[in-house]
Amino acid sequence: MIRTSSVLNSTKYFNSHINHLSSHGDHKQVLSTFSSMLANKLLPDTFTFPSLLKACASLQRLSFGLSIHQQVLVNGFSSDFYISSSLVNLYAKFGLLAHARKVFEEMRERDVVHWTAMIGCYSRAGIVGEACSLVNEMRFQGIKPGPVTLLEMLSGVLEITQLQCLHDFAVIYGFDCDIAVMNSMLNLYCKCDHVGDAKDLFDQMEQRDMVSWNTMISGYASVGNMSEILKLLYRMRGDGLRPDQQTFGASLSVSGTMCDLEMGRMLHCQIVKTGFDVDMHLKTALITMYLKCGKEEASYRVLETIPNKDVVCWTVMISGLMRLGRAEKALIVFSEMLQSGSDLSSEAIASVVASCAQLGSFDLGASVHGYVLRHGYTLDTPALNSLITMYAKCGHLDKSLVIFERMNERDLVSWNAIISGYAQNVDLCKALLLFEEMKFKTVQQVDSFTVVSLLQACSSAGALPVGKLIHCIVIRSFIRPCSLVDTALVDMYSKCGYLEAAQRCFDSISWKDVVSWGILIAGYGFHGKGDIALEIYSEFLHSGMEPNHVIFLAVLSSCSHNGMVQQGLKIFSSMVRDFGVEPNHEHLACVVDLLCRAKRIEDAFKFYKENFTRPSIDVLGIILDACRANGKTEVEDIICEDMIELKPGDAGHYVKLGHSFAAMKRWDDVSESWNQMRSLGLKKLPGWSKIEMNGKTTTFFMNHTSHSDDTVSLLKLLSREMMQFGSNN
C-alpha cells in the first residue's frame, strides 16, 4: 500500500509539472518531462495525455502524437472527455479529416469546443460546405456556436459569397460586437479584393483596436490607395492611437510601389519621431522604398545606420540595385556583405549572379559560383535559374546545360532560361529540341517568354519555316492575345522578309504600342519599301501616340536604306522641333549614313563634326567607306588621321585604314596599320554568311575551300540557267 501511494504521488507530481509547463507554452519541456516520467517507470493517466497531445500539435510532432493516441487506446482512455477533445484538435491541426472525424464520432459527449475543433478541421481544408453542415447539426443538437466557432469557419473562406453568408451569421448570433471576429472579417474582405466592403464594416465597428486599423491600412496598401491610407492615419491620431511597425511597413510599401518619394520621406520622418527607426524590418522597408523611388544614395544612408546587418537587408539592397540597373554597385554591396560575415541567402546569390550576367562578366560570375560551391551553400531553383542565364549570356552554353541537367526540380523559368540561352546564341536547333523535350517531359504549359525567345532566334537566323511552326504553336496554345508575342511575330516575319504576314500580325494586335509600330516601319524600310514605311509612320502620328527614340530610329533607318535623303533630314529636324525628342548617337549615325549613301560625303563629315560631342570611330568608319567608294581622298585623308588618334581596338578598323592608305598609295602607312594590329594581338575574322534551305542551315566563309567541287558545279549550273533565261527574254 505504501508503494502504491508513493507511485500515485509521483504521477500526480509529474502531471502537475507537465500541466504547468503546458499552460506557459513550454511544449518542448512537456515532452522532455514526459520522457523523464517514463524513465522513472511511472505510467501516465487521464490527466497526462491532454497536455502531451497539445504539445504534439504545437510542435508539429505528428508521429509522436500518433504513438500517444496508441497509448490512449491501450490504457482504455479513449472515452475520456478531455483526451478525445485533444485528439480532435491534434488531427485538426494536421488536416487529417478522417482521423479527426473518427475520434469525433466515437465521443459520448460533445461540447462547443469539440464541435468547433471539427468545424475548423474542415474549414482549413477548404471544405467550407461540410463545416457549415456541422454548424447546422450542432445547432440541431442544442449547442450554440461561439465566437471561436465562427473564427474557425472563417479560417478556410476564399470566396466573397461565403464571407457574406458568415457575416450575416455573425450578426444573427450577435458576434458583430466581438472585435476578433470583426478583424478577421476585415482581413478577408481585403483578401477578396472587396476593400470597399471592408471599409463599410470598419466604419460600423463600435470598437477598434490596433489590429483593426492595421488590417484596413494593409487592405488599402494592397490596392495602392495612398490617399485612403493618409485619411486613416489622421483618423488614428484623432482616436488617440499611434502608428506601429505594421502601420508604417504597409504605408512604406505603397510609397515604394507608387514611387511616391515625398510620402516616403514624410513616413521616414514619422518613424524617426516615434522611435521606430531602430526596428530592423522598418529599416529594410525604408531601403526598399528609396530604391523603388530611384534614390540609391538615400538607401545607402539607411543601410549604414544598421549596426548588425542581417541577410535580409543585404539582399534587399542588392536586388534593388539590380532593378535599377546598377550591376556594378550591386556587386560592391555583395562584397561588403561577404566581408561582414553575413550568411548568403539564395535570393542574394540569384541577384548577384544576375548582376554578372548584366555586365557580361563570365569570370566574375564563375567566381561567385565557385565561392558558393566552396562554402557549401544549397542553391534553390531561382538561384540555379540565374546561373543558367548568366552562363548563357556569357556564351558558355555547355555550363548552362550542365547546371540545367543536374537540377532536381525544374520550373517553367528553368526551361525558359535554357531555351532562351540557346536561342539568343542562335543555336535554333538545340533550342527547338529543348522546347520539344519540355513539352514531352513536363506538364508545363508553353508561355509567352518561351515563344518570344524562339521567335527571336528565328528572326536572327532568318528561319521562316520554323517561325511559322512556332506561330502555329502560339495559336494552338491559346497564348494570344499577348503584346510580347504579337510584337515578336511581327519582328520575325519582318526580318524574314515576309512583310504580308508581318502586316497581318500587326493588324491583329488590339493595342499597338510604340515598339510594334517601330518594328513594322523598320521591316518595310530594310526590305526596300521606304515609301510604305513612311506611310506607316504617318498612320502612327495620326493614331495619337507620341513618337519616341525607337520610332525615329526606325524611320531614319528606313530613309537611309532607301536613299530618301530629303524626307530623312526633314524627319530628323522634326524630332526636337515638333516632338522634343533629343537625338542620341544612333540617330546621328543614321543621318551620317543617309548622307553617305547619297554620296554627300562632305555634308556627312560636316554633320559629324557639328553634332558629335565625342569622337565615334564607328561613324568615322562609315564615312571612310563612303570616301573610298566615291574617291573623296581629301576627306578620306582627314578621317584616317582622326581614326589613328582614337587608337581603335577592333581589327576591322585597322583593315579599313589599310585599304584606304593603299588607295592613296601611302604604303608606309599601310604597313604601319597592319603592324599596329598585330602588336595589339588583333585578328580580323573572315566575312561569313549563312543560308537556310529545307530546314538545314549552311554557313559560308570568305575564301572557303571546303566542298569546292560542289560549289563550282552549282555556280556553273546557275550560270547556264541565267544565260538561258536571258536568251529567252
From Swiss-Prot:
Superkingdom of the source species: Eukaryota
Pfam families for this protein: E_motif, PPR, PPR_2
PPR repeat positions: 10-44, 45-79, 80-110, 111-145, 178-208, 209-243, 244-278, 279-309, 310-344, 345-379, 380-414, 415-445, 447-481, 482-512, 513-547, 548-583, 584-618
Keywords from the UniProt entry: Repeat
GO BP terms, alphabetized: RNA modification
Family annotation (InterPro entries): E_motif, Pentatricopeptide_rpt, PPR_At4g14850-like_plant, TPR-like_helical_dom_sf
Residues covered by region (Type E(+) motif): 695-723
Family affiliation: Belongs to the PPR family. PCMP-E subfamily.
This protein's name: Pentatricopeptide repeat-containing protein At4g04370
Provenance organism: Arabidopsis thaliana
Organism lineage: Eukaryota, Viridiplantae, Streptophyta, Embryophyta, Tracheophyta
